[in-house]
UniProtKB/Swiss-Prot annotation:
EC number of the protein: 2.4.2.9
Protein name as it appears in the record: Uracil phosphoribosyltransferase
Keywords: Allosteric enzyme, Glycosyltransferase, GTP-binding, Magnesium, Nucleotide-binding, Transferase
CDD domains documented for this protein: PRTases_typeI (cd06223)
Pfam families the record matches: UPRTase
Cofactor(s) named in the record: Mg(2+)
Cofactor note: Binds 1 Mg(2+) ion per subunit. The magnesium is bound as Mg-PRPP.
Protein source organism: Lachnoclostridium phytofermentans (strain ATCC 700394 / DSM 18823 / ISDg) (Clostridium phytofermentans)
Amino acid sequence: MSNVCIMDHPLIQHKIGIMRMKTTSTKEFRDLVAEVAMLIYYEASRNLPLADKEVETPLTKAIVKEIEGKKLCVVPILRAGMHMADGILNLTPNAKVGHIGLYRNEETLEPVEYFCKLPSDAPDREIFVVDPMLATGGSAIAAITLLKRRGIEKIRFLCLIAAPEGLKKLQEAHPDVDVFIGALDERLNEQGYILPGLGDAGDRIYGTK
């Protein structure tokens, strides 16, 4: 079964608390998505492989560490995942970015793919799939399945908020994918939304309804 890391860092919990508030403005919510994503990514990237490299300091030569190969790729699930990617790129600006477009059928709650664009060398890269909400698990499962069909094996999934139902389904479908979660909430409601959650992340990021 995959490893699941639920964040307990005070900064993450504080920022998610602000995001939950219905009075939080669109701009503040958008900024917080990027900030929390960056903090979660910090933990998710903890075990990236390192290699030695010799450099010259102003005084002498030194052996330093660098991420081996530097082959990272962030894959946001459109559209809400885009601002999570922005936060991650603040830490690793040279990472490549792929995009997967999925929307949820409001009757079946199942994801429907409408777009996929990935770097040509994606199978050689460490892939970080990002989506703010892990609700039913359908979008995350579909996105990861799509990546695996393209020969990609090194995949991690990052989200801000998860429901137990969605996490369970994701683990059952992809037990080899490690999952990093900002907060694990109580449950889903009848419409498939996370409770207490923070509303529709995409709408709150973009100021739409």
